[in-house]
Every structure is written in C-alpha cells, then in structure tokens.
Amino acid sequence: MYSNSNAFLGGANSLRPGQQPQQQQQQYGAPSPFGQQGPMQPQPTGFAPQPTGFAPQPTGFGQQQTGYGQQQQQPLQQQFTGYPGLQAPQQQPQLQQQFTGFQPQATGFQPQVTGFQPQATGFQPQAPQQQPFQTGMPPVPAIPQQFQQQQSFQQQQQQQQQPSIQQPQPTGFPSVQIQAPAQQPAPTAQGGIAPPPPVKPQATGFSEMAASFQTAGGKGRRAEQKTNTVKIPNIRLSFITAHDQARFETLFKSAVGEGQTTMSGEKARDLLLRSKLDGDSLSQIWTLADTTRSGQLHFPEFALAMYLCNLKITGKALPSVLPDHIKNEVSSMVDIINFSITDDAGSSSAPASNAPSFATQQNTAAVPTIQQPQPQPSNSAILQAQMTGFPAQQTGFMGQNQGLQPQQTGFPGMNPQPTGYAGPMPPMPPMPTGFGSNLSPNAGPGGMVAPLNSQPTGMPGQWGLVNTPATGLPLIDALQARMMPQLGREQRNYTTAGLQGNAVIPWAITKDEKTRYDALFRAWDGLNKGFIAGDAAIEIFGQSGLDKPDLERIWTLADNGNKGRLDLDEFAVAMHLIYRKLNGYPIPNQLPPELVPPSARNLSASIGMVKNMLHQESELRKNTGASLLPQKTGVSYLKGHSFKNTGANRKDATVFKNNDEEVGYRSSARRRVGTSPRPESPAASNSGDDLTIEQLRKKIKEKQVLLDAMDFNDEKNMEEDDILDRRDRREADELYRRIRRIQEDIDNHPDAQLMSADSDAERRALKRQLQQLTDRIPELASQVRKTEKAIADARLELFRLKDAKAHPNSAAAIVGTGPGGMVTESDRIKARAKAMMQQRTAALMGKKIDIGDDDADGPKRLEEENIKIKTEKENNERMVRDVEDSVREFAKGIEDSLKEGAPDSTSEHEKRRWEDALGVEDEVRDFIFDLQRESRAARIRSQDRQGGRKATQEPVKAEAPVSTRVETPSPSISRTSTPASTAGGGSYSSYKTPEERAAFIKQQAEQRMAERLAALGLKAPGKPGETAAQRAERERAERAEKRRQAEEEDARREAERQAKLAEEEGGPAPVASPKADSRPPPPPPSRKAGKADDRRDEEAAAKKAEEERLEREREEQERETRELEESAKAQEDELAKERAEADARLKALEEQVRLGKLKKEEEKRKKKAAMAEAKEKEAQLAARRAEIEAARKREEELRKQLEAIDDEDSSSSDEEGPEQITPQASTPTVGGSQVGTHEQEPNSPPPPAPASVASPPQIVTTSPNAERESRNPYFKMMSQSSEASTSSVAAPVASPPPPADVSTNPFHRMTQAAAAPAAAVSSAVSGAVSGISDAISGVMPSRRRPNDDDDDDWGSEKGSDDEDSDDEGRPGGNSAAALASILFGTMAPPRPLSATGEKPTASTPPVVSSPSSPPPPPAPVEPSAGSPPPPPPPPPGPPPAPSGGAPPPPPPPPPMPESGAPAAPPPPPPPGPPPAPGAVPPPPPPPPGGAPAPSLPAGRPAGLLGEIQAGRALKKTQTKDKSQAAVAGRVLD
C-alpha cells in the first residue's frame, strides 16, 4: 500500500523532516523520494536500443513500466539513492544523454505526469538541481522543456489545493540543501512559495547525516571522505562527558589520519606530552590506557588516556587499576572497532552522542514555506497502479508492498491512494481528522495494535508502574492527541498552550499513562521495528512545545546507553518526563529508580560481571597453567548444562590429545580381507634373501662396530655418572658435616637450654596474661574516674566550708543544680528571691537581717573554685585517657609481636618435615634422627658438666632471673665468652688452609671425647694450656660449690625438721644456724697424663669461663639463700619468744583461774552459811553435786584441749601461729571479738597490745587447726575470744611478765599495730583484763575495791549486751541464772556480785562468752546458782568458771563448764587442753575480755566487735549476768 519507506519514522516519502534516508534504505531497502523517477532513469539505460519498440508502451503502460522497472530492473539503485555521496558526479553526462534518448517516453509519460500532478510539482525544482543532486543520489533524468510549463502549472494548482501537504515534502529531498548558488533561482518558479534562503533550516530534518552538506557540495564530499576514513562506534563512554568525547574524537581523527583506526605510540606520546605531566605519571597513564598492550591506542583507549591526564592535572590520584566498568566499556568499544562493527547512522557533526539535535526544530515549524511540495502519495499510487498493469509482477510487488504497509501506518490517508490514481488529495483530509480510525485499518492486517495495547497491563510492578492517582491525569488526553502523527504538523509552531497544568504526578509511570504512551509508540513505529530513532523523536517531542534544552535533557535521561533510539519503555519514560514538565515538575538530573526500565537496570553491571568472570578465568588458566592441564592430566573442563544427563557419552574436546605416532591412513589395513592378519612388508620379508655372504659379513661387522661404539658410549656415560655421583656424595657429606657442626654449635651455646621450652605454650600464656592485664584497664580507669569525681566533690565542699568560715557574713552559698554542681543563672535568681523573701519576712516581723558585704563575691568565688576544680578534673581525665590509649597501643604492639612469631602452616610443614623427618628419603631421615640423638646427648653432657647446679637451682628457681641480671654487668662474661665460642668450634669455614682445618677437626674430636668421658663418669684429661695452679683452683672452686650446695640443702632440711618438732612440742622452733664447713674438701682427682697440651689449654679456657659464670651464679644464689635463712631465723626467734611468752601467760592464767575458783568457792560457802533455810542447803548440795560432775567433765575437756593445743602448736604455720594463740576451748566464748581480729590476721596476726598488756594472742599457734577447721563458722570467733581472754587475764595477774616486744615478730611488723592508738589499746586491754578477773574471781572481786574497775568494765559490757540482747534469742527468764552458772560455774550470787560493778568501761566489749553454744543451758544454770553453797573441790571449780563460754544446749546447769569447753571452738577442734591456750579462758568470760583485745587493733569498742562477730548467747548471757550481778551485788554488800 505504501511505496516508500516508513512514513511514520520520517522517511523520504513522509511529510516530516528529519528521517535519514540512509537508515531507511539500509533497513528496508526502500526507494528514496525520487524512487520512481530514479528507477525510470535506469530503465532508459537498460532499454536504450528499444525506445522505438517501447514507444507504444509508455503511453499505455508508462506508469506500469516505470513501476516495473523500479521493482525489477534496478532495485539496488533505489537503495543507494538514500546515500547522498555514493554516486560519482561522472554520471551526469550519462544521465543527460539518457534523457535525450527517452524523450519519446517522456511524451508517453506525459499522462502520468498530469495524472500525478503532485509528483511533477515535486520535481519541478529538481531540473536545475540535478547537477549537485547527483552527488547525493542516483542520476535523475531531466524533464524536457516542453513539460516545464505544464509541471509548473500543475505545481501551482497543487499548491493551491494542498499547501499543507506540499510544503513539508521537501524534507524528503536532502539534496535540495546542496543547491549551488547558480541553481537557487530555480525554486522561484514555484511562484515564490519556497524562497532559496529558507532552505538552510531544512538541515534539522537530517541533523545526523546532512550536517556535512550545510554549506556546499564540496564540503559535503569532504565530510563524506572524512567519515569514511575513521569510523568510530557511536557509543557513549560513561566516564567522560559527551562534549569531551566529541572533542577527543575530533582530536583523534585529526591525529590518526585517513585509513587508520589506531593512534601510534609516537603520536600518542606527542599528544600526552602536551599535558606537561611528569614522566612517571604519563608512563602510568599509558599502562592503564593501553588495554590491548599493542603499543597503539584505539579511540576509547585514547579517550581514557585523556581522561586520566585530566584527573592528574586536577590533582587527583591515578588509580592503580582501572575500575571494572571503565575497563569493560573500553574493551567493548575496542572489540567493536576491531571487528569493524560501526554505526554509520551516527556520522554527524556531533558523533560522540546519539541524542538527536533539537537545534532547529522550532525554526522548521515556524517557516513552512521553506519546504517544497512533493506529492509522494501519488508516487505510491503510481506504484500500485503499475502493479495492476502487471498482474504477475504485481503479485510479487504486492508482497513487498504489504511488507512495507506497517510503515505506512503513520499515513492512514494513503490507504485509498493505491486504489485511485488521481486521488492523493481526497484521502488526505481524513488523516488529520482522526488518526485512530485510520490506524486501525492499517494495523488490522498486521494484527499488532490490539495485543500490544493490552500488554502494559501485565507490566505493572516490574519497574515502578503504579495505579492512577485519585486526582486522575488531567490533560493526558490532550497530550496524546497532540503527539499522534497527523498531516500538516510540520507547519505548526507548537507551544505548551493547552498542555500545561498543575496535576499531582508520581515519579513512577501510572498504568493509564503507560497504555497511552505505548499506543503513541506503536503509532509512530509503523514498521514494528521496536524503537523510534532520534530524528523521529525530534518531531514527536517537539509537538509538546517544550524548549530545546529541556528536550535534550529528557532525551539524555531516557536514552539509556546512548543508543540514539528509544525502545518502548524508554519512550514511555521520555513521555512521562515531558508530561511531568508540562505540569510544572522539574526535570531530574538523574533518572530516579522508579523510572529505570528493567531492560537497562542491571544490564551494564551484569555485562561487566560476566566480563570480569571470563577475564579472571582466562588469567587463572594462563597463570596457573590450567590451560595445559587437559593434555597432562586428562581433567575435563567440559561444562555440563543439564541437571539430568550426565554427558558421559558426549565427546569432550577439552581432554583431547593428538597422538603423533598414530598414522591416519594405512593402505594395507584398508585392503585386508576379513580378519586376516596384516601381511608382512615385502621389504622386511625379502630384505635378507637377496644378500650374499660377503654382504652379510659386512653387515655383521658394521653391526659389531656399532655395538662396540655403543658399549664405549655406555662405559663413558657410566664413568661420567660415577664421577657425578662421587661429587654429589662429597657435597652431600660436606653438607652433613656442616649441619652437624652447626647443630653442635647450637647445643654448645649457653642459651641452648631455652630451646627445649615450648614457645607456643609460652606465647599463649603471655597472650592470656596480656589479655588479663588489658581487661583490667577499663576497671582501673573507672576507679580512677570515680576517685577523681569524689575528690572534686570533696574539694568543692571543702571550699564551701572554708569560704563560709572565712566570710561568716557572706550570704549563704548558692547550691548549684547545673551539671557537676555548677551554679546556673536560675540558681542565682532563686537565691536572690529567697534573700528578698527573708528580708520581707524580717521586716514584717520586726527583725533585722544582716546582709553580708560580699554577697556577690561569694558565688563568684565558688564559681571560680568550681571552674578550677573542673578544669583540673578535665586535665586528669585527659591524662587518664592518654594513659588508656597508650596502654592499649602498647598492648596492641605486644600482641602483634606475639602474633608475628606464631607458626603458620608453611613453617609447621617445614618443621614436621625437617624435625620429624616426615616425607624425606631414608638416608635423610636417618641423618635427622642421628642429629636429634646427638643433640640430646650433648644436652645431657652439658648438664653433667654443670654438676649439681641444676638441682640447687630448682629450689630457688624464682630467683633465677635475678641472678641473670646480676651476671650481665660483669665484664668477665664477655671476656670469657670469646674463648668459649672459639672453643665451640662453630667457625670451621674461618680456617682457610688444610692444616688449620685439620687442627680444628682434631680439636673438636678431642673435645667430644672429653665430653663423652665426663658423661661416663671418667675424668677427662687436663685442658691444653692449663697450668697446675689453674687446674687446682678450678677444682677447688668446684668442690667448694658442691660443698656449699650440700650444706645449704642440709641446713634447710634441718631447719624444717626442727620447726616441725617445735610445733609438735609446742615450744619455739629452734632457729637453724648455718653449719661451719667441717668437711674437708675432697682430694683433687688424680690428673691423667697423655693428652696433648693444646687440647688441655682450650678445654681449660672454656671450662674456666664456664666456671666463672657458674661461680657468679652460685654466689648470687648463696647470697639470696643467706638472706632467706636470716629472715627465717628471725621469724623463728620471734616465734620462740612468742611461744615462751604464751607459755608464761598460760601459766599465769591457769594460776589466776585456780585462785578465782577458790575465791568463788569461798563466796559460795559464805552465801550458803548466810542462808539458814534447808531449801537453800538442798540447792547448794545439788549444785555441789552438779559442780563435781561438771568439774570432772571440765578436767577431761581441759586435757583434751591441752592435747589439741599441743597438736595445734606442732602443726601451726609460722604465719598463722601468732594469730590464733588462745586455745580453741576458750575461743567459743568470744566469737564476735575474734572475728574482728581474724580479719586483721593477715596483716598483723598478733594484736598490737600496749606496753601494759603483753601480747596474749601469741600463746599457741593454732593455724593448723584453723586451716583444718576453716569451714567451721565459729572458728574465727573462738580463736579471737581466746586471744582476748588471755590478754585480758594476763594484765590483772602480775605473775605473767608482759612480753618484751611483740614487734620482733615479722608478722607483727606486717600487722596494723600502729593503727590503734596506745591509749585505746590500753583501755581496751584493761577492760578485758578486768572482765576476765571478774569472771574468774566471781563475786569475790566485786566485793573488793580493787575489782571495782573490773566490775565497771563488766557492767559496761552488760550494758552493751543489753542493747544487743535482742539479737541473741536466748530465753530471758533464765538468762541471769544461766549467765551466772556459765561465767562462774557456781551459785548465781557470785555472778551478780561480779557484775555489781556497773561502771561502764568503754574499752571492754560485752562479754560474749557463749557464741556458739545454744541457749538451753541457762535454765539449768539457775538451780546451779542456788546450789553454790556446797564448795566444790578446786578442780571442779575451775571448770565451772569456764562455763562462761556458752555451753552446748544439752548440758544442764552443770554442763555450763562443759559448754564452756565445747563452746570454745566447734566441738572437735576447739577442745584445747585448759592449760595451753587458756582453755584458760575456759571461763568464757575471758573471751569477752579477749573481745576487746581484738578490737584494740581496730580501735573500735570491743562491745561492737562482740555484737558483730560474737554469738548471740554471749550477749544474752552478759545481759543476764548484769541484772543478776546488780541485784546480788547489792545484797552482798
């Protein structure tokens, strides 16, 4: 239906400018706008001899012939008509001659011209234009003069009828622009409708092709030649701008010249040197740019080099490796150039960009008269009419025409033109009126429009399609109508009027929009090519009325990849951007993700990834030799593309290997019959048959000669092999010797012992230690910060106090509420308001308020001080942070250094290979094992040479580092090390002459022999060069060292034995005194003669050096040992003194206890005599019986306690001995006080007693028991109570002398003795003593004046106990009697009497005598109190007194004594014999006294410690005693 190319894409026949004829003809082979006359021109050439014969045909079938000729004779020439410069001007004369020859045909053609007035009018201006036009198109025959007038008339008539159609037609005549100045007047024949000057804007229709023809034909030819010389793919490079790419292309073309596609290295160097960059930079740029490593630059590589130069000039760093996307782009473009895949459509003035030129689109529409009429619809009608004239040809042509019909969809009005010859005009009106109706008939035959319109519905969600907004899409219909192809649109000057609005449009394309845009795309894509070219886009987008810059930006955004055309999705994106722009939205600088089509989203990235993968694979195969593996290993690289088929039967070319031995063709094999064997070669079978005997002999001789020669060669080769083997063996032996020497040097090195250490384990231990220390950093920093904050707050508070004191009249300091206690403005306002309120209140009340003079200065001073403190705090914080950072850096450095030496897989492999002999030959393995055995033997020999040094070093291993430090300063080491090292013989290579080497080897052999003799216990011969005096001195030093070591060991063992015996006996451990050297030194070993002197000298020098070093080590060790012994002796002396003092105190306490018991008995007897009633006597009798029984039990308990104390003394350690001196029997009585002292035991086991009181705690060392019974909760309390009781009792009793000086004990030195003031200690001790004496003496002391103090103390204790009695939980009714029975073991009255003294003694803590015992015993105690009258025997008496200790619940009142004993400690360990520790305190009361003693070091009242640490029973017992004591005391008085 349509004769020519796609009218909807701006083809030659279309009425729109801008289509490039060459593109159309390339794709579809459609004829040019002159396609009908063009074919007529070749017809005459083909039928030149037949003009007369064809004369009738032109008249009747002129049109058909032209059409037939167009189709059959010269279809190729029609295709070339679209290429402006393909035909040479030489054809002009031929064309003119042809025309002259065909004048008769022209006459026959006349009806055609008249019938096709539009065509004739279109050709009117071409008669004068033929000469220049021929350069761009095939020759067109000149129209005879006789038809000029008719044509002009017809042209005018057509212009009147269809001016709108005729004007745009000139766009199909690219050659019109090339008119020569002489030919320009020709258009005036058109009646002035098309003046010559406006022809220039016509270039807009061919912006990409005809730009080179804008001035003249010559220029056009030159441009053609240039474009033909250097063809550059029309591909945009993303890393440079389009403008830069255009400039680089121009520069590249000018530098390359004609016929070249690459720039030589010399030219590239000259161009790059203009950048004034240094040589290194240019070298790096060349390395990066020359991706093909060919020494030449393709255009993309040249552009890359210019881009890199620009980077360097602007101060940016050059990349070491090209980014992947740049490398892939450059390589792709280079490949296209190398394969000559170029896009000629892009040969325009701006070849770097495929974007269409919107430069003059507006002007073309504004000057419609520029375009000349071209009745192209009539051409199509003519062609179709020719079909009807030739049915057979028509069918063939109809197929072609039907194939071209989709292109004609842009011109639906042309459908009726084929049916009617004279009707091109009538069908035109329907075109503008409605395009849709005309589109449907065109699309109907193709069947494409309907399904394509529905396709967008399936696309939403793929690349941002969204539903239409609720507000709808205003003016979208108007935009669609404006954009549809229609006649006469070229004459219009489009504006945005009627399309602008302010609708709300989302970024994403709506479904409705996509449907409309797809319909637009298909309307313009008449041939269903799937894209719209740039020149068509100029026309389409220009109808929107937007400015050229906006359209250019929209094109740039929509044309992804700079292809120069838009597909369906990209066209929708461009239309959407136009629609947004019309509604007031700005054009984005970058396409948002919602508008990126799926086809272009990840295309470049995926291509780049595939390229990278291929490149990496090829590099890997090239570098690793994998490309050769199939030939070597048979590994198959065949890729399997199926999940089901294994492909086992497929031929694998990757493992193919040609067999050179295999012969492809064997004639004998081909001619064999069946399975018969291959016949023998005739030459092989008959070769020996024809030879004579002489010939055979000759051959035998020759073979013999050859055999002899072969034997000779074999012998020669064997000799050479033997020589090589011997040489290799010598070299191997030499290597073995060298390795052995090096191993010997290693073994003889002084630090060889360190090699045995497990470096990995040590490294791991160091890492753990480093990690632990590093973990402590935050904690320490936090503590430091807390301390800093506390200091700052304290300083601020101190300043407030000082300021208030210095300025008493100043206003009250303002309390700051700001951060860090800062005073804010609100605080000042509040303070002023408060002051004003106070003044007003005072004024109302008539008072007067003094306002300080420096009211304003106070806050200032506070603020300054606050700022000062804060500044100092910040400085300290910075210092802490700096310390933290430095410590972390240091730790990191240490960790890195530890990691550096860590073994890796390679080193581990090497170690296993060369140390464990894995994976080596047998000979090498044997050699390695031999070396290891020799190394072990060498270590053993070195240890034997050192003698017993190692044994002595083990006890003092901790001091080893000290000795090493002491060694280093001595200069003798360096002096002796030199001979030692030389003697080691590790420098074999240093000897040059054979004699020296022989002497050296001999020396080494002698040395090894001496070592072996020493290992066997034999005396090695004297060292060469060693005199008798030196040898004697050395041996004397060795004997002395051994003797010292033996004596030190004996002394140490003796000291341990004595200490153990002393502990078992309970006496002070004897101090081990160093024994004088009594043993005579052993006689020097007899010297064996018979060894060379030189060897003796060397051995003597080496041994002397070693002896000196060992001597220094021994001296250091001896010094440290002496110091340890001295300190141990001092400690033992102190312990002995303490034991002696403890014994004396125990004796005194025992005597005091006995006297106290006697006094209590006397008091009981007096009380019993005072009572006349029989009831009291019975009670006394019962009490006496109970006391007797209790006395027996008490005696047993005291014996047990004594044994336990002895055991404890024997097993106690030096450290804990002084702390737990009191017997455990007594300890229970003072549970609370003991705990206080026990806490201080580690520092100062013995409480720092004042001079007045001897340090009692050191009576007996019970640390062993403490260790065994540390799980007992009462252990601490009991031990301390015993200590306290002993100390308190010691004071009242004059018999025990106070200890000379407690400080002599090293443990005392460590204690906090100095912490407690002497006065507090003395008072506490006195209170404790008084309490104990009261408890011992019972009522007797209370009656005496001297015991008043004790009574007071006791009373004070009770007072404190009363306060804490609630804690005890003992029964209150029986508390008095129970206390009495517990404390005094006799009647109740004596206890009250003892407690009568109610004068509180601050120093004495409450007597918590029964910490561990349960309360039950108190009840029975009351009866015992009543029974006191019968005087129990003295032994029983003492036990009752101890009863003060809380008895175990089970025993009745009498058990009180029992309870005292058991209560003392947890029953098992506590029971200590009364004698030693004071089971003495058997009367638990002493423990109260003891309680103060522990409190002494702490300086706190003993009662407080008693409350905290003592048992509840003690407190309650004291409370009861107090009440009873008060009453009884008064009665007694």
UniProtKB/Swiss-Prot annotation:
Its placement in the membrane is given as: Peripheral membrane protein
The EF-hand domain extends over: 277-312, 546-581
Kindly list the places in or outside the cell where this protein is found, as annotated in its UniProt entry. Answer: Cell membrane; Endosome membrane; Cytoplasm, Cytoskeleton, Actin patch
Q: What segments bear the compositional bias annotation Low complexity? A: 19-46, 53-136, 143-170, 177-193, 345-359, 968-982, 1279-1293
CDD domains with a match to the protein in the record: EH
Domain WH2 residues, every copy? 1500-1517
Q: Which residues fall in a coiled-coil region?
A: 690-890, 1026-1209
Give the compositionally biased regions (Acidic residues). 1204-1218, 1348-1367
Q: Which keywords does UniProt give here? A: Actin-binding, Cell membrane, Coiled coil, Cytoplasm, Cytoskeleton, Endocytosis, Endosome, Membrane, Repeat
**Where does the record place Polar residues bias?**
360-378, 393-410, 1221-1237
Indicate where this protein is primarily found. membrane
* One Pfam short name: DUF1720
EH domain boundaries: 244-333, 513-602
Can the keyword Cell membrane be found in this entry's annotation? Answer: yes
Q: Which InterPro entries match?
A: DUF1720, EF-hand-dom_pair, EF_hand_dom, EH_dom
Q: Which domain of life is it from?
A: Eukaryota
Q: Where is this region: Disordered?
A: 1-204, 345-378, 393-423, 649-691, 894-917, 935-1306, 1334-1533
- Pro residues bias spans: 1412-1495
Gene Ontology CC terms:
actin cortical patch; cytoplasm; endosome membrane; plasma membrane
Renumbered to this chain, the Basic and acidic residues biased-composition regions fall at 649-664, 894-916, 935-947, 1031-1063, 1090-1164, 1173-1203
What is one GO biological process annotated to this record?
A: endosomal transport
Function field: Component of the PAN1 actin cytoskeleton-regulatory complex required for the internalization of endosomes during actin-coupled endocytosis. The complex links the site of endocytosis to the cell membrane-associated actin cytoskeleton. Mediates uptake of external molecules and vacuolar degradation of plasma membrane proteins. Plays a role in the proper organization of the cell membrane-associated actin cytoskeleton and promotes its destabilization.
How is the subunit organization of this protein annotated in UniProt?
Answer: Component of the PAN1 actin cytoskeleton-regulatory complex.
Question: Which family, according to UniProt?
Answer: Belongs to the PAN1 family.
What name appears for this protein in its UniProt entry? Actin cytoskeleton-regulatory complex protein pan-1
Organism from which the protein derives? Neurospora crassa (strain ATCC 24698 / 74-OR23-1A / CBS 708.71 / DSM 1257 / FGSC 987)
Question: What taxonomic lineage is listed for the species of origin?
Answer: Eukaryota, Fungi, Dikarya, Ascomycota, Pezizomycotina
User: Gene for this protein?
Assistant: pan-1
